[in-house]
Amino acid sequence: AYPGNGVHCGKYSCTVDKQTAIGNIGNNAA
């Protein structure tokens, strides 16, 4: 999980960090 980012994309899929997802969707591309 990365602070301030709700969605984290890996090689094959994206995961959601529920603790930081609110208001921070799609900010992390790596």
UniProtKB/Swiss-Prot annotation:
Gene Ontology, cellular component aspect: extracellular region
Coiled coil: none
GO biological process: defense response to Gram-positive bacterium; killing of cells of another organism
Keyword Secreted recorded: yes
Activity dependence on pH, as recorded: Stable below pH 6.
Cysteine disulfide links: 9-14
InterPro entries listed in its UniProt record: Bacteriocin_IIa_dom_sf (IPR023388)
Temperature dependence, free-text field: Stable below 60 degrees Celsius. Activity decreases sharply at temperatures above 60 degrees Celsius.
Domain of life: Bacteria
Subcellular location: Secreted
Principal location: secreted
Family label: Belongs to the bacteriocin class IIA/YGNGV family.
Function, in words: Has antibacterial activity against the Gram-positive bacterium L.monocytogenes.
Name the UniProt record assigns to this protein: Bacteriocin curvaticin
Organism of this sequence: Latilactobacillus curvatus
